[in-house]
Every structure is written in structure tokens, then in C-alpha cells.
């Protein structure tokens, strides 16, 4: 039986090659916690965006040499994911103010470039916090809706 709180930590080079490894690990963590398919897919997109931002921006002044830390904290009703780097920081509020709001009727060819990753992360996750001290740390939380099946008309939680 799974304990009420598990903690998994990864340290990977700041390279796009490792995004798929992180996504695969996330899928396993979320599946083990009983998350729905939609929650897993949302979290995979959000984490991919955060890691890709770290790969593209954090270490560009350091010849793209650096480490990205990823933490998964599995709690009773949610999974908290923290992604951090020690690279160059950015002004979150300034970046956020430039990305939206978007008009649903706006032609996609004319959307502003950049910042969509932050927009996606905030749209897909339940809680998002960005810290900028020595590098950038993005903390995101997804509340888990347990996968359920029907058994003779009754909903049964899969555990």
C-alpha cells in the first residue's frame, strides 16, 4: 500500500534530450497515484513547457551547461511538482503581462511569440508559483481526481 506522502527527485542535464525521460517519469508517478488520463496529459504538457523553458533560457549564457532539478511530491489528493534551475532568471510579472489576454477570434498567425509556455502551465495546472532567487523555480500542483470505473452501476475508485 502506498504511503500518504511520497517524494521523488530527479537531476538531469539541461538538455532537450531529457524532456521525454521526465515525461515518462511523470506518467509513472501520476499513474501510481491513480490520476486520470486527462490529468496525466495536462501535467505532461505543463512540465514539458517548464523544462523546455529552463533548457532554452536558463543556461544560454553558460553554453547550455547546467542541471535541472525535478521534484514530485505525492500527497493524498494532489501531486506537487517543482522544477528548478540555477541559470538566468526572468521577470515573471513582466513576462506574464505581455502574454495575454488572448482573443479567441485572433488569427493564430498574429499571436505574440514567447510566453505561451507560462500561459499553458497556468491553464493546465491547479496552482502555479514562480520563484526567482538563484535561478528559477516553478512550483505547480495538480489536484488528483482518482480514476474510476463502473461496477454494476456503481462508481468504484481504482487504487
Swiss-Prot record:
Top-level taxon in the UniProt lineage: Bacteria
SUPFAM superfamilies: ATPase domain of HSP90 chaperone/DNA topoisomerase II/histidine kinase (SSF55874)
Membrane-traversing stretches: none
Reaction(s) the record says it catalyses: L-seryl-[protein] + ATP = O-phospho-L-seryl-[protein] + ADP + H(+); L-threonyl-[protein] + ATP = O-phospho-L-threonyl-[protein] + ADP + H(+)
CDD domains: HATPase_RsbW-like (cd16936)
Keyword Metal-binding carried by entry: no
Record keywords, A-Z: ATP-binding, Kinase, Nucleotide-binding, Serine/threonine-protein kinase, Transferase
InterPro entries according to UniProt: Anti-sigma-factor_SerPK, HATPase_C_sf, RsbW
EC number: 2.7.11.1
Keyword Protease among record annotations: no
Gene Ontology molecular function terms on file: ATP binding; protein serine kinase activity; protein serine/threonine kinase activity; sigma factor antagonist activity
Pfam families linked to this entry: HATPase_c_2
Family: Belongs to the anti-sigma-factor family.
Role played: Negative regulator of sigma-B activity. Phosphorylates and inactivates its specific antagonist protein, RsbV. Upon phosphorylation of RsbV, RsbW is released and binds to sigma-B, thereby blocking its ability to form an RNA polymerase holoenzyme (E-sigma-B).
Protein name per its UniProtKB record: Serine-protein kinase RsbW
Protein species of origin: Staphylococcus aureus (strain bovine RF122 / ET3-1)
Amino acid at each position: 500500500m502506498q504511503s500518504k506522502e511520497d517524494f521523488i527527485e530527479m537531476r538531469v542535464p539541461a538538455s532537450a534530450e531529457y524532456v521525454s525521460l521526465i515525461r515518462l517519469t511523470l506518467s509513472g508517478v501520476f499513474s501510481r497515484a491513480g490520476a486520470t488520463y486527462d490529468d496525466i496529459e495536462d501535467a505532461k504538457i505543463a512540465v514539458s513547457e517548464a523544462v523546455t523553458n529552463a533548457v532554452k533560457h536558463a543556461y544560454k549564457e553558460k553554453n547550455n551547461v547546467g542541471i535541472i532539478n525535478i521534484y514530485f511530491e505525492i500527497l493524498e489528493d494532489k501531486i506537487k511538482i517543482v522544477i528548478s534551475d540555477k541559470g538566468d532568471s526572468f521577470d515573471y510579472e513582466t513576462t506574464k503581462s505581455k502574454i495575454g489576454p488572448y482573443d479567441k477570434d485572433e488569427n493564430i498567425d498574429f499571436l505574440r511569440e514567447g510566453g505561451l509556455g507560462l500561459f499553458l502551465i497556468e491553464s493546465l495546472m491547479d496552482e502555479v508559483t514562480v520563484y526567482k532567487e538563484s535561478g528559477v523555480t516553478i512550483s505547480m500542483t495538480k489536484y488528483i481526481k482518482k480514476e474510476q470505473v463502473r461496477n454494476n452501476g456503481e462508481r468504484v475508485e481504482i487504487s
